[in-house]
């Protein structure tokens, strides 16, 4: 029998009832717990780092060709820090919401808290609806992007099938994520995912340096404002992967320890993205403008094929990360979220995969779609809405006085915190959504005009006779 140990944890004003499971004493039980049941700080770090870097690792050199080397590096650092800030803000709001609810004796043991519920509990139904719309739409297209990336990558190993056919195949494969109950169960997958992207990043870096600069290579970026802001918005998308922050926090045994995890994960991710993007851009320059997937320019070797296979597995994992919150929303809508039957939940989840599959076939534009999603959805989902929600939540003096998490002292208290939130909201609204949205939509429409909807093989080289 599995016994439960309920522990009261007090951290400042934070009171939480934790539930820790004692696994079976058998070898099988211990192995299952080791690989399957994750809730530690390390699990959260692996989840954040693994989920953040994903397929954008392959499109960042493309962004560098649009931005130029200096702007590419600066935007990565800038948006990395900004993303870490809003992830921190989301974590503060989660802790505030959960603390208030647990003081009311609400039990979350069979219920996964999500971002729209945090907004609902703190600010009301209008904020809930806003958060639900942007979060679900972003995660929907985030899943679409992973599916497109699978087809784009496998094509560089096996081009006997076109990318659309590969999308059909991988759509069926990714549908198996319906059997993964929650973020608790991504322990081994998150770890392996980060190992895979680490290998791929350093392969790209070393292979580009060994290849040397291509003949007559040019580094003319930035040349057009449209390309410049498209590239910048892809980087905004890169460091805006924290639409699943609340679900990752909820999977932790001690969610209040999350505060700095995303920043530390981002710093590690930068050790992968900066060298790889810079090296590939140095080697291939403007050629990347027509090759949004960096792997398409690197010579085919066993190392490259290994990178492709590892990224395919990682994209399957990231598909699960993006889709699992959608599964939760759908379960709650149908009233089966708290059922203990895994098979019943899996069957209920299957319809969620169908629109993702369909959209990946309509818009197979690997690279350009990242920027479009970044400007129109990520800008609000993980930057603007969290910053505004935090300011409104703590607008009154009593709310600030009773806040569970106080502002860091080095910021200068509430004034400093509000100043940062205002800057983030205004910057992302003007540069990310405004200029980025304009540029990304122009580029996206250009891809549709060039390749058409339902493109059979986006950016595929002509087949040799």
UniProtKB/Swiss-Prot annotation:
GO terms for cellular component: plasma membrane. Residues 1-52, 94-129, 187-189, 247-259, 329-349, 396-421 are cytoplasmic. The keyword Membrane applies. It is found in: Cell membrane. InterPro entries: AA_transpt_TM (IPR013057). It comes from the Eukaryota. GO terms for biological process: amino acid transport; auxin-activated signaling pathway. Residues 71-72, 151-165, 211-225, 281-307, 371-374, 443-465 are extracellular. It is a multi-pass membrane protein. GO terms for molecular function: symporter activity. Keywords: Amino-acid transport, Auxin signaling pathway, Cell membrane, Membrane, Symport, Transmembrane, Transmembrane helix, Transport. Shoots and roots of nodulating plants. Low levels in roots, nodules, stems, petioles, leaves, shoot apices and flowers. Belongs to the amino acid/polyamine transporter 2 family. Amino acid/auxin permease (AAAP) (TC 2.A.18.1) subfamily. This is Auxin transporter-like protein 3. It comes from Medicago truncatula.
